UniProtKB/Swiss-Prot annotation:
<dbReference type="GO" id="GO:0005737">
    <property type="term" value="C:cytoplasm"/>
</dbReference>
<keyword id="KW-0704">Schiff base</keyword>
<comment type="similarity">
    <text>Belongs to the ThiG family.</text>
</comment>
<dbReference type="InterPro" id="IPR013785">
    <property type="entry name" value="Aldolase_TIM"/>
</dbReference>
<comment type="function">
    <text>Catalyzes the rearrangement of 1-deoxy-D-xylulose 5-phosphate (DXP) to produce the thiazole phosphate moiety of thiamine. Sulfur is provided by the thiocarboxylate moiety of the carrier protein ThiS. In vitro, sulfur can be provided by H(2)S.</text>
</comment>
<keyword id="KW-0963">Cytoplasm</keyword>
<feature type="binding site">
    <location>
        <begin position="218"/>
        <end position="219"/>
    </location>
    <ligand>
        <name>1-deoxy-D-xylulose 5-phosphate</name>
    </ligand>
</feature>
<dbReference type="InterPro" id="IPR033983">
    <property type="entry name" value="Thiazole_synthase_ThiG"/>
</dbReference>
<feature type="binding site">
    <location>
        <position position="169"/>
    </location>
    <ligand>
        <name>1-deoxy-D-xylulose 5-phosphate</name>
    </ligand>
</feature>
<comment type="pathway">
    <text>Cofactor biosynthesis; thiamine diphosphate biosynthesis.</text>
</comment>
<feature type="binding site">
    <location>
        <begin position="196"/>
        <end position="197"/>
    </location>
    <ligand>
        <name>1-deoxy-D-xylulose 5-phosphate</name>
    </ligand>
</feature>
<dbReference type="GO" id="GO:0009229">
    <property type="term" value="P:thiamine diphosphate biosynthetic process"/>
</dbReference>
<dbReference type="Pfam" id="PF05690">
    <property type="entry name" value="ThiG"/>
</dbReference>
<keyword id="KW-0784">Thiamine biosynthesis</keyword>
<dbReference type="GO" id="GO:1990107">
    <property type="term" value="F:thiazole synthase activity"/>
</dbReference>
<protein>
    <recommendedName>
        <fullName>Thiazole synthase</fullName>
        <ecNumber>2.8.1.10</ecNumber>
    </recommendedName>
</protein>
<dbReference type="InterPro" id="IPR008867">
    <property type="entry name" value="ThiG"/>
</dbReference>
Length: 275
């Protein structure tokens, strides 16, 4: 089976009641130009494009009728988010506005609890998620790798989670590998998307090898020297990590083990080993 067939047909990403061919989600902010964003989307073929309603304005390159027209023409599903919200009420209101504007029930839920780390508010996040799910939203909550928080989000009705790898925009990669791997182990049947903190394609490959279902990127692509090439690199890295996971990596060993069999070697090699 080719990797193309694996991605598009045999191994789709399943979120709520929908399936997606790609396991990469892409943000739309901070690109050098609208053209670079458009080109990055075309080469990476993401499952969804995240859009922060609060950050858009008619006078910015990321806002206005031209921006929305470009998104529609790309034909990629839009995932609005509640970036910049600091309370459950604020996030709820912005989500309702996003639903009306984008005509979608999808929402990436962000409720920030700390300005310095942009860490999610672990109390307000489940409360906001519960309200939105009651209203029919398909909520993808931005959270940490905290297992208790993640279980609480599942309890209120979330069917997928988006734990961070590191604080937003840092590009540090997974700062708590143990916690992320444990979360994957304890929630084996829950779609998990690593959101925030990935900086280079190898980070995406790593978390996909751990069994994560998808990755979401923005700054790592938008602020790269060549955003289009980086978008393509991340798409390939994500697919490589997924294929490696499904292929069953060899177990790690503490001691060396020869990869070349000794059967059939000349007799004097056997004598040397016995000596």
């Amino acid at each position: 089976m080719t990797t193309t067939n694996l991605s598009a047909v045999a191994d789709p990403l399943r979120l709520y009641d929908e399936t997606f061919a790609s396991r990469l989600l892409l943000g739309t902010a901070r690109y050098p130009s609208p053209q670079s964003l458009e080109d990055a989307v075309r080469v990476s073929n993401p499952a969804m494009l995240t859009v922060a309603l609060r950050r858009q304005s008619a006078g910015s390159p990321e806002g206005g009728a031209g921006f929305w027209k470009m998104l529609r023409e790309l034909g990629v599903p839009v995932l609005p988010n509640t970036a910049g919200c600091y309370s459950a009420d604020e996030a709820y209101t912005l989500a309702q506005m996003s639903r009306e504007l984008f005509e979608t029930d999808w929402i990436k839920l962000e409720v920030i609890g700390d300005d310095y780390t942009l860490q999610p508010d672990t109390l307000a996040l489940p409360a906001a998620a519960e309200r939105l799910i009651r209203d029919g939203f398909k909520v993808l909550p931005y959270c940490t790798e905290d297992l208790v928080l993640c279980r609480r989000l599942l309890d209120v009705g979330c069917q997928a989670l988006m734990p961070w790898a590191a604080p937003i925009g840092t590009g540090r990669g997974p700062t708590n590998p143990y916690g992320l791997r444990l979360l994957r182990e304890r929630l084996p049947n829950v779609p998990l998307i690593v959101d925030a903190g990935l900086g280079v394609p190898s980070h995406a490959t790593q978390v996909m090898e751990w069994g994560y279902d998808a990755v979401l990127l923005n700054t790592a692509v938008a602020q790269a020297g060549d955003p289009v090439a980086m978008a393509q690199a991340f798409a390939m890295a994500t697919q490589a990590g997924r294929l490696a996971r499904l292929s069953g990596p060899m177990p790690e060993r503490d001691v060396a083990q020869a990869s070349t069999p000794v059967v059939g070697l000349p007799f004097w090699h056997a004598e040397e080993k016995q000596a």
